[in-house]
């Protein structure tokens, strides 16, 4: 166990020399370890506990993009047996937040301001959650594109989350 911890520490140190973003450092260090992305996703969900209700697992993270999966299970189903749209919105807020933290310039900070979503088809399978950010980071309102897809690739929810971006004090 001690060797595994030392190995992980060395990997993190190597990434910190090339990148300054904590979320990306953790992602790159943990993606190579079996179950590592599940651990990372759960750690992030502990920061904002309501994310634990949908148990998202990050599958891909890079500057400007976060993807995660969300299992269709009884805890997130509605009365007709599909994934409840509010659970999907919760998952979309998760990927948006992770994507923003992995992408935002160090002199800026953000807060979510609003969400607009359209329900475009039934969510009758596990869900893939995606958030995409453009590279234009300016003070003021900014929209992050979000989409949720079924396993067959069919979109079930499309929309955007508006952020309020300000300079750090």
Model-derived features with residue positions:
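HotDog/MaoC-like acyl-thioester-processing domains
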Residues: 2-35, 124, 132-169
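N-terminal short leaders/motifs
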Residues: 2-22, 66-74, 101-112
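Hot-dog-fold acyl-thioester-processing enzymes
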Residues: 24-25, 46, 71-97
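Active-site-proximal helix-loop elements at catalytic-domain edges
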Residues: 34-58
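Catalytic strand-loop segment that frames the active site of acyl-thioester-processing enzymes
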Residues: 50-83
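A generic structural signal for short beta-strands and their flanking turns/coil linkers
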Residues: 54, 64-66, 111-115, 125-127, ...
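Hydrophobic alpha-helical segments of small multi-pass membrane proteins
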Residues: 86, 90-94, 114-119, 146-150, ...
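Hydrophobic beta-strand-centered segment that forms part of the acyl-chain substrate-binding groove
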Residues: 98-134
